[in-house]
């Protein structure tokens, strides 16, 4: 193993521990593990087809032996495959040769050893392996970690539902909301993208060198190969069958998947920046951890480093995922090899995503609302009530309500409760409406924000 301090990529160096869960999935070992699963399940599937007499049904013992290799593929096994590849200079062929050698002592498999990789092009094995890897990453890592963020934010939205906050549009004071409602907005966005990620299909094919079952049909013309291959992809592997391909599966679903991850990342980048700003305004304080240093020269500093780290890593993720989404669906004629090296970087895009998720969650866990700062901003900005006053004036037919409030408040300093009180008292509107306006404060002018936050 490489010493993390000597690693070229920070994913395998400084951040190695944070992406540990992805290593068995996206490493070269992970790709080999998936290839072994596909090759052996394909052999098992061939043995279930009565018209392929040369591969009779396997005994329970043989099936158990095959499953053991699938489930227990080890780093030592991967090293043995690499040793074979040193001679073949072909990674998929090395898997085939290793499997033949590995099962030389299992009579039923040894007798059918030439049906390992039968009628397959390398891409038949690779595309299914990549689909299995992405599916595993989604189920084992991405969805659970995103669910953790959504759960944390939902709790914060409920807890802070009634804490009033001055909004800012264009960076300027705007109609109040609550802290909880602003967080609820993010929760709703993430929930939608979570569902999109959940619904993503992972496509696969095993239809030969150019997608037409050419070799299959020559060898066994009486087999319904399309049905057989569909059942293999969908039932044996749990993927979605793609019936129309060239040599490679076109990777459109990969682009969809990576774009779905990018949308999640973009939402979190947006929220990272907002929280960074709220910390700067004093709306949130950060819990201080003993022993930590905020600046090498300014001892007082408590910086929003987790949100900055998250923003940076999610930006890196989106750069990689964006390239994958744009490049992978493009291949010259029936195939070129440009996708091969690019696909080895799937784990990089997902890895930076996971780093960004983890940093964001760390930051959330350090946040504490600062009610005093929130209240002070609201209390210093009574011009926020110009909106409700002119709206009520419109209801009761007062002439030029917007213009009157604009003249009273726009660009003016020192709009106090007293100034607004005098203005309201001068209005020719029903006494009940006037009384309600006189009772209104910036902190109370939050509409349905609390209700909306609690409902998320």
Task: Tell where the protein language model's regions lie, with residue ranges.
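Glycine-rich anion/phosphate-binding loop at the beta-strand->alpha-helix junction
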Residues: 193, 246-332
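Active-site-adjacent "gating/activation" loops or surface patches in catalytic cores
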Residues: 223-247, 251
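Short amphipathic alpha-helical segments with heptad-repeat character
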Residues: 135-143, 147-150, 154, 184-187, ...
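Generic, well-ordered alpha-helical scaffold segments in large soluble proteins
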Residues: 41-46, 98, 102, 137, ...
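Glycine-rich cofactor-pocket loops
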Residues: 158-180, 285-301, 332-341, 365-380
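A helix-coil-helix interface module used to build multimeric assemblies
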Residues: 1-216, 220-231, 294, 307-309, ...
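Long, amphipathic alpha-helical stalk/connector segments used for oligomerization, subunit docking
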Residues: 309, 313-400, 404
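Amphipathic, heptad-repeat alpha-helical segments used for oligomerization and assembly
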Residues: 240-261, 336, 340, 420-423
């Amino acid at each position: 193993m490489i010493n993390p301090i000597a690693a070229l990529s920070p994913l395998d160096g400084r951040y190695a521990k944070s992406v540990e869960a992805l290593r068995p999935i996206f490493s070269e070992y992970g790709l080999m593990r998936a290839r072994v699963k596909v090759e052996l399940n394909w052999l098992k599937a061939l043995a279930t087809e009565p018209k392929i007499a040369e591969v009779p049904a396997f005994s329970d013992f043989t099936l158990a032996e095959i499953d053991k290799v699938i489930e227990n593929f080890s780093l030592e096994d991967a090293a043995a495959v690499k040793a074979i590849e040193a001679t073949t200079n072909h990674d998929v062929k090395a898997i085939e040769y290793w499997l033949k050698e590995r099962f030389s002592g299992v009579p039923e498999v040894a007798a059918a050893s030439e049906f390992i990789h039968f009628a397959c092009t390398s891409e038949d094995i690779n595309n299914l392996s990549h689909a299995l890897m992405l599916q595993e990453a989604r189920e084992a890592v991405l969805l659970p970690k995103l669910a953790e963020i959504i759960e944390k934010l939902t709790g914060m939205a409920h807890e802070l539902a009634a804490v009033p906050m001055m909004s800012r549009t264009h960076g300027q004071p705007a109609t109040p909301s609550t802290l909880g409602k602003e967080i609820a907005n993010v929760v709703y966005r993430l929930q939608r993208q979570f569902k999109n990620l959940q619904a993503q299909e992972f496509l696969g094919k095993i239809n030969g060198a150019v997608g037409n079952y050419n070799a299959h049909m020559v060898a066994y013309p009486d087999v319904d190969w399309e049905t057989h291959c569909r059942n293999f992809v969908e039932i044996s592997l749990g993927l979605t069958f793609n019936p129309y391909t060239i040599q490679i599966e076109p990777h459109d679903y990969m682009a969809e998947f990576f774009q779905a991850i990018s949308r999640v990342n973009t939402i979190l980048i947006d929220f990272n920046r907002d929280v960074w700003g709220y910390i700067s305004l004093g709306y949130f304080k950060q819990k201080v951890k003993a022993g930590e240093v905020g600046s090498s020269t300014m001892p007082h500093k408590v910086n929003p480093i987790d949100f900055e780290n998250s923003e940076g890593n999610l930006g890196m993720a989106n750069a990689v995922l964006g390239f994958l989404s744009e490049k992978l669906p493009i291949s010259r004629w029936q195939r070129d090899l440009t996708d091969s090296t690019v696909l080895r970087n799937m784990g990089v895009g997902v890895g930076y995503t996971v780093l960004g998720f983890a940093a964001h969650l760390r930051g959330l866990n350090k946040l504490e609302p600062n009610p005093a700062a929130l209240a002070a901003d609201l209390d210093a900005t009574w011009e926020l009530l110009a909106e409700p006053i002119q709206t009520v004036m419109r209801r009761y037919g007062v002439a030029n309500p917007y213009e009157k409030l604009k003249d009273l408040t726009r660009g003016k300093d020192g709009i106090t409760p007293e100034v607004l009180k005098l203005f309201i008292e001068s209005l020719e509107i029903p006494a009940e409406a006037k009384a309600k306006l006189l009772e209104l404060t910036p902190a109370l002018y939050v509409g349905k924000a609390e209700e909306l936050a609690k409902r998320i």
